[in-house]
Amino acid sequence: KCVNNLSSIGKALVGFTHDNGGRLPWQLISSQKRDHFGANYVEDLGPVFSTAAMKSELQTAEILWSPCDAEREAANENAAKGWSGYNAKTGNLISNTAISYVLIKGADIGRPSTILSTTRNLTFCNLATGKWAGADENPIPDHAMSGLNKSQGQLVLADGSAMQSTDADLGSFGKI
């Protein structure tokens, strides 16, 4: 289910680029930012997933929650109830605590093997140095997800393929 959700997020992001000159939400030019965010543009999950375009692509907040992330289930259930009211232009944003995934700033739709999004359990927001944090570590990292152990994560590529991942996939010499 988590990989399926990431696949849906990947498709939503690719759909967004088709309508925006090949640009992802964080790559928009000023006029496009105004169109999608009004005066509320911030490079953050809540604003991106609260744009009308992304909401239309995703259809429900439930896609933004991973079954591997029990800690965020209640917040996501509340977000699902308020889904119709979220609007980046008015500043009514979905809470980051309702989202189990992160977006990768260096993603490039023109490069199909780049990573668009991952589960939120990366140790660093840097794919070259990050590892997958796990609930089996002691102490448990803040960004660990209850259903994923150390060296377990999931990701979606710009070509739309979503998969499970290990630490061997990440880093300067990673498989991906």
Question: Where do the model's predicted regions map?
Answer:
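Short, well-structured segments within or immediately adjacent to enzyme catalytic domains
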Residues: 2-176
